[in-house]
């Protein structure tokens, strides 16, 4: 064979080998024009966007853009936390909250104290706390002559101001983790217009001991614009809420969730208030302390299965639940030690290394929820994580926990064709992103990660929607 054809064949062989590498599949592909146009309208440069698009079955990369660059993922960090939890604990795993009745019970009276020990359950909401106290009453207790003692020792974390992240301490997404987290340390105000009385009734849940909130606010005419601002509520003390403004009739019924302004005492006020509402009497007080270590609990309250918790974390991007899970993973690894943030970070990075290899600078773990300015992850690493999940025994559980575009959760307002993608969203002031699975017209399934880090990030949402729509149309296969 002449030398020139041999050299040509050798070159073709080299190209074939190189094209087996992920980069080769995307070297000639640019961003879709509709995505570029949407970025331009948002005044966001292409350099602010990272993308990794893979075929879910083969793992073949069909579009990559700065995929190895570590960027702030915002709530996409929850994918790492929830995937690790499903892998390490399993979808049916539950938290256990033990309860002790320390003392004899005679004629409806507990001659001693009631102890409740937290283990990180993120779903100890008012309804489940009611069930816990109802169980106490079913054991014959109507009056407690001692104290109700709350044990938070399973987590060893520093107290902090809920407003530290963004100055919005009254927003529930800023609530801090707690081994005994009750009702997300938040209250809910429901406003119900009563046209005949010319007021909106204010309903407060849950009942808190010592709480005094205005039970009504005057109705006003006009549109329902900034209805929260129109109330002119003083949020400095949520246990003594007063409204100096009005509520527009046009708003109909609305709900306003608020983080309690005194989280350190919230549990005590909630348990005392709920116990009293249930007809119980308490001669002592509700206080923090240590549960008995040498006796078996009188009973235990089981949480919903992990799958339900993961679904709520991912569908609705619940930060405090994600942080509870993050710390729980460390606690389960070393159950004889209180979980710390440092231990939780180490545990999560160890899991990523075991399952995906050493991430290096492509992963910076902070608090498990993504509510952070310091967290970092690459689009490549998130895509590999989603491929791992796709081929795992818990594939269906993780995928079903993600918002469905145009249907539910944080994706209900997506502009892409509804019902064809399961995608976790990530949003901060300067971050916008999605990560998950997209089903195309032909039935192909793609793994998609797209993140924008820029001051105008949220204006780039239409560009991300356009990228999702492009994948749905099988454009990557053309």
Describe every region a protein language model picked out.
Residues 59, 78-85, 148, 180, ...:
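Residue-level preference for non-acidic, small/hydrophobic
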Residues 10-22:
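Bacterial N-terminal signal peptides
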Residues 64-84:
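Short active-site loop at a secondary-structure junction
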Residues 65-71, 257-258, 369-372:
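A short glycine/serine-rich beta->alpha loop
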Residues 31-39, 88-360, 466, 473-477:
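Conserved serine DD-peptidase/penicillin-binding transpeptidase domain
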Residues 1-5:
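N-terminal secretory signal peptides that target proteins for export/translocation
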Residues 62-64, 316, 326-478:
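Small-residue-rich helix-loop
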Residues 26-70, 95, 130, 135-138:
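Beta-lactamase-like hydrolase cores
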């Amino acid at each position: 064979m002449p030398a020139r054809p041999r050299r040509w064949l050798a070159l073709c062989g080299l190209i074939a080998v190189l094209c087996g590498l992920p980069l080769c599949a995307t070297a000639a592909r640019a961003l879709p024009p509709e995505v570029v146009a949407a970025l331009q309208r948002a005044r966001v440069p292409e350099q602010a966007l990272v993308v990794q698009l893979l075929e879910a079955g083969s793992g073949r990369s069909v579009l990559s853009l700065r995929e190895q660059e570590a960027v702030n993922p915002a709530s996409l960090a929850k994918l790492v936390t929830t995937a690790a939890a499903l892998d390490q604990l399993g979808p049916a795993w539950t938290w256990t909250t033990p309860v002790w009745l320390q003392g004899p019970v005679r004629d409806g009276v507990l001659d001693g104290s009631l102890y409740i020990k937290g283990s990180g359950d993120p779903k100890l909401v008012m309804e489940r706390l009611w069930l816990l106290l109802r169980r106490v009453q079913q054991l014959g207790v109507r009056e407690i002559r001692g104290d109700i003692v709350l044990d938070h020792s399973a987590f060893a974390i520093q107290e902090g101001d809920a407003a530290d992240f963004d100055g919005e301490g009254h927003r529930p997404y800023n609530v801090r983790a707690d081994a005994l987290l009750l009702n997300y340390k938040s209250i809910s105000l429901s406003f119900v217009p009563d046209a005949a009385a010319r007021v909106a009734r204010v309903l407060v849940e849950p009942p808190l001991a010592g709480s005094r909130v205005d039970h009504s606010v005057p109705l006003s005419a006009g549109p329902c614009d900034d209805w929260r601002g129109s109330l002119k509520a003083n949020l400095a003390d949520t246990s003594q809420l007063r409204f100096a403004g009005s509520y527009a009739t046009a708003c109909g019924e609305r709900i306003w969730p608020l983080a309690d302004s005194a989280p350190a005492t919230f549990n005590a006020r909630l348990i005392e208030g709920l116990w009293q509402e249930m007809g119980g009497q308490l001669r002592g007080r509700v206080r923090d302390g240590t549960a008995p270590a040498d006796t078996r609990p009188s009973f235990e309250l089981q949480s919903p299965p992990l799958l339900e918790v993961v679904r709520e974390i991912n569908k609705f991007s619940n930060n405090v639940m994600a942080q509870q899970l993050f710390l729980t993973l460390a606690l389960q690894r070393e159950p004889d030690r209180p979980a710390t943030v440092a231990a939780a970070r180490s545990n999560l990075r160890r899991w990523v290394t075991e399952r995906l290899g050493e991430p290096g600078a492509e992963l910076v773990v902070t608090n498990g929820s993504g509510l952070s300015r310091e967290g970092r992850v690459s689009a490549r690493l998130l895509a590999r994580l989603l491929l791992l999940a796709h081929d795992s025994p818990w594939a269906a559980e993780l995928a079903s926990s993600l918002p469905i575009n145009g249907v539910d959760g944080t994706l209900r307002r997506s502009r892409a064709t509804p019902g064809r993608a399961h995608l976790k969203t990530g949003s901060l002031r300067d971050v916008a992103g999605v990560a998950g699975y997209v089903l195309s017209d032909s039935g192909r399934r793609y793994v998609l990660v797209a993140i924008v880090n820029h001051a105008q990030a949220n204006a780039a949402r239409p560009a991300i929607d356009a990228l999702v729509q492009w994948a749905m149309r099988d454009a990557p296969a053309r």
